[in-house]
Amino acid sequence: MENQSLMPREKLLKSGAETLENYELLAIFLRTGIKNCPVIQLSQAVLRYFGSLRGLISADQEQFCQFKGIGITQYIQLQACTEMTKRYLAEELTFAHEFTNPLTVRLYLQTELEHYEREVFSVLFLDNQHRLIKKEDMFRGTINAASVYPREIIKTALYCNAAALILAHNHPSGSAEPSASDKQMTKRIQAAAELMEIRVLDHFVIGKGCYFSFAEQDWL
């Protein structure tokens, strides 16, 4: 076992995971280095290669395994960790007594949407206490657009007896700035929802490491 890999673990136990640098967290995940490259050095090299933790996590299998020192085993483990994080955030929403934590919602949506290379339009369907009933990817599109049909959203909302909605879609370009069509689409969905006494609580636009909230800007 390498002494370098013990240091981050000891730091985590003493001060908490939040005190660790990204490369230290990755070193704990990797556990060991390779010949002539201790695990700390390896983790730093991995992050430089992929640019960030987000770049590492969003890499596909081929991209991930191209880096010497990490392979299919680490790829599988990382995908499992990422999926567990998504499900944890989903459970946080599902089991919350009331939907009062916009930060949890935003982190969940960023985790779900920002890695897509095509535009995906998702909807969170909430009950009358603003607890999550389900999340559904309603529409998928191209690199810069997705066709969205308010009628389909409302039909699904009525089917699952939702009282409120949170809308979200990603911008693969990386910018979270809403377009004119995003604004118009939101108004159309909100108008259709109001006819059925369903509230639209927010619309998140997810970019690369950034987001835009219609509710935060009082656009709803």
Swiss-Prot record:
UniProt short sequence motif JAMM motif, positions renumbered to this chain: 169-182
SS bonds (residue pairs): none
Domain (MPN) ranges: 98-220
Alphabetized InterPro entries for the sequence: MPN, RadC_JAB, RuvA_2-like, UPF0758, UPF0758_CS, UPF0758_N
Domain of life of the source: Bacteria
A GO biological process held by the record: proteolysis
Gene3D superfamilies: Cytidine Deaminase, domain 2 (3.40.140.10)
Keywords: Hydrolase, Metal-binding, Metalloprotease, Protease, Zinc
Entry GO MF terms: metal ion binding; metallopeptidase activity
Keyword presence, Amino-acid biosynthesis: no
Binding site for Zn(2+): 169, 171, 182
SUPFAM superfamilies per record: RuvA domain 2-like
Family the UniProt entry places it in: Belongs to the UPF0758 family.
Protein's name according to its UniProt entry: UPF0758 protein Asuc_0013
Record organism: Actinobacillus succinogenes (strain ATCC 55618 / DSM 22257 / CCUG 43843 / 130Z)
